[in-house]
Amino acid sequence: MEENIKIEVTDKDVYKHYFSSILIYGIVFLALSICPVLNEQIEHDFCNYIVVLGAYYIGYVALALPIFLFFRPESILESRSVAILDFIKRQFKFGLTVEERIKNIEPKENEKQALVILFVKAFFGYYCVNLLCNKYILSMGYNIDFLKEFFNQAVQYGSVSGSSFGIAQYIDDTFDMWRQLIVMVITFVLGFSYLTELDLFKNKIKTVDTTPLGIITCISCYYPFLILTDKLIPRFPEQAIPVDNFTLRIILNVLVVLAHLGMMLAVLRLGTKAGNLTNRGIVTSFPYNIVRHPEYSMNMIYIILTTIPVMLLGEFSMFGKIIIACGIGLWIYLYYLRAVTEERNLLQDSEYQEYVKKVTKRFIPKVF
C-alpha cells in the first residue's frame, strides 16, 4: 500500500515563488499607478489607491520572504506567480514553428487560472481601495456626526409632531448617509477579501471562472467598464427619483436602505470568502440557506426601486417608458447572467453540488 508522501518545500521553491511574486505584483502595481483612466479617479493626495496599494506592496516585499521561509506553505509548490512567468517566458521562445507558436499562446489550465486570479485581485482590489479612499474613509466621521445631529433633530420633531413624524423625517433626511455607510462596510469587506488569501482567513481560492461570458458580465458592472454599460443600458441613480409625495418617498427610502442591508448581510456572511468570480469555499448559513444569491436578489430589488418610480412618475413619452422598462429588464438579466456563470464555476465543487440540491432557488425563495 502506498503511503502519502509529504513533499518538502525547499529554500529554492520559496525564493522562486517570492521573487516571481514581487516581479508580477510590481508590474501590476506600476500598471495601476500609471493608467490614465484610473488616475482620473484620484481625489486626494495622501489617501488614494496608489498610496494604499504601494504600502501594501512594500509590506509584501518586506514581510513575505521571512514568513514563507518560516511557515513554508505547500501552496508555494503550485505558485501562481511562477505559472504566470512560465507562460510569459514561453511566448518568447525562439526557433518555434507557427503551429508551436500558436499552441504556446493558449495558456495551460493552471496558467489560465493564475492569470484570471491575478486580474480579479488587481482589478477588484483597486476598485474597492479607490472607492474607500474617494468616498468613504475621509468622510466617515462627518457622516456619523451628520446622523447624530439629525437624530437629535428627529427627537425634536417627534416631541412636537409625534414620534412617527420624527422617525419619518429622520429617514427622509438621512437615508442616503445610511446607504453610504452600508456600502462602505460592504466595500471594506470585499477589499479585504480581494487583497488577502490565507489559510488563517479561510479564503484560499480553489478555482476562478475563466470563461469570457463570466468575466465580461461581471466587470461590466464596475468602473471603468461601467461607462460602456451605461451607454448601452439606461440607468438612473436613486437621487433622480421624482417623488414629491412625502409618504411614498419615505417608503421608497426605507426599502432602498433595507435592500442595502440585505446586500451587507449577504457579504458579511461570506466574510473573507466574499468576492467576484472565485470559489473560496461554500457558505450555507442564513441567508444562503434561503436562496443561493441573496446579494444579487437585493441588487435586483434596488434596481427596481430606483427605476420604476422614474418610469411611472417621470414625464416620459410611451417610447421613453419602453426604453426604461427595457433597461430595467437588461440590468436584471445582467445579474441573472452573473449568477449563472458563477454557478458554472462553483458546480465544479462537489460541496456546492450538494448545496444546490438543498437550496434549489437562486433569487426568490420557493419561486425562482
What would you call each of these model-derived segments?
Residues 2-277, 305-347, 351-368:
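Membrane-anchoring alpha-helices and their flanking helix-loop junctions
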Residues 280-288, 297:
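Alpha-helical membrane-protein architecture signal
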Residues 285, 289-292, 357:
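Short amphipathic alpha-helical coupling elements at transmembrane boundaries
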